[in-house]
């Protein structure tokens, strides 16, 4: 029995609230149950030095957690003077995931920065960030097109992500913190709208997972991502 009472293949309630902030070209508040992440997409008319004069743009991400987004307060990383390895890993994951849906040449010589700030954490912050940041990115690119700064949208697909794992011997979808902290296996899966895998990150905590367990988890991920893709579509059409 899951602590939340959900079925093994059941997502938490998911909400995507667009245009959540005033200034960013794209902004989305994404909610996976009690996990809430603010995703903003900012367009900058410059690219990294290694991309100058190459006729293409860049999409990157930054990730952070508010000091009291968890049960106990954590100092801001800026106060510590450096980012933690976990933060660097997550923001690179978000950037890689979103670039998988972008034609960088169509974007032109500019970059889009996705800032993903965790307001409240209850498991699955990186997968929520990817799912919400995609919608913010689409809104930013649509604005560029509306303003005539690009001729066509550089977005050629959809990207969403979800966590899966093995909790008390059972493969489950979309782990919250109570499950994640006790899971024998935890995996984050990034996929596109065609059912293709962009990234899988899986770790066994208690015992090594078997091939049949891996298959069960990826099948759950496919089910969950398909629902998230549809939620994104509905949000963008609203």
From Swiss-Prot:
One of its GO terms (biological process) is rRNA catabolic process. Its EC number is 2.7.7.56. InterPro entries: ExoRNase_PH_dom1, ExoRNase_PH_dom2, ExoRNase_PH_dom2_sf, PNPase/RNase_PH_dom_sf, Ribosomal_Su5_D2-typ_SF, RNase_PH, RNase_PH_bac-type, RNase_PH_CS. It catalyses: tRNA(n+1) + phosphate = tRNA(n) + a ribonucleoside 5'-diphosphate. Phosphate binds at residues 86, 124-126. Keywords: Nucleotidyltransferase, RNA-binding, rRNA processing, Transferase, tRNA processing, tRNA-binding. It comes from the Bacteria. The keyword rRNA processing applies. One of its GO terms (molecular function) is tRNA nucleotidyltransferase activity. Phosphorolytic 3'-5' exoribonuclease that plays an important role in tRNA 3'-end maturation. Removes nucleotide residues following the 3'-CCA terminus of tRNAs; can also add nucleotides to the ends of RNA molecules by using nucleoside diphosphates as substrates, but this may not be physiologically important. Probably plays a role in initiation of 16S rRNA degradation (leading to ribosome degradation) during starvation. Homohexameric ring arranged as a trimer of dimers. Belongs to the RNase PH family. This is Ribonuclease PH. The gene is rph.
């Amino acid at each position: 029995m899951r602590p939340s009472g959900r079925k093994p293949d059941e997502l938490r309630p998911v909400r995507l609230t667009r245009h959540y902030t005033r200034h960013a070209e794209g902004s989305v508040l994404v909610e996976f149950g009690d996990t809430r992440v603010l995703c903003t997409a900012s367009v900058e008319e410059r690219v990294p030095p290694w991309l100058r004069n190459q006729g293409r743009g860049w999409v990157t991400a930054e990730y952070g957690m508010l000091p009291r987004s968890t049960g106990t307060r954590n100092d801001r990383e800026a106060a510590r003077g450096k980012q933690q390895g976990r933060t660097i890993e997550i923001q690179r994951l978000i950037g890689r995931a979103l670039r998988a849906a972008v034609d960088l040449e169509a974007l032109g010589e500019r970059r889009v920065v996705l800032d993903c700030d965790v307001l409240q954490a209850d498991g699955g912050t990186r997968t929520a960030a990817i799912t919400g940041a995609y919608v913010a990115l689409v809104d930013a690119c649509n604005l560029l097109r509306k303003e005539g700064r690009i001729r066509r949208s550089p977005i050629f697909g959809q990207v969403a992500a979800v966590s899966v794992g093995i909790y008390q011997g059972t493969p489950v979808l979309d782990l919250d913190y109570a499950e994640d902290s006790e899971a024998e296996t935890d995996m984050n899966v990034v996929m596109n709208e065609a059912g293709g895998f962009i990234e899988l990150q899986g770790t066994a905590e208690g015992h090594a997972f078997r091939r049949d367990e891996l298959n069960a988890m990826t099948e759950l991920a496919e089910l969950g991502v398909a629902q998230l893709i549809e939620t994104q579509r509905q949000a963008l059409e609203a």
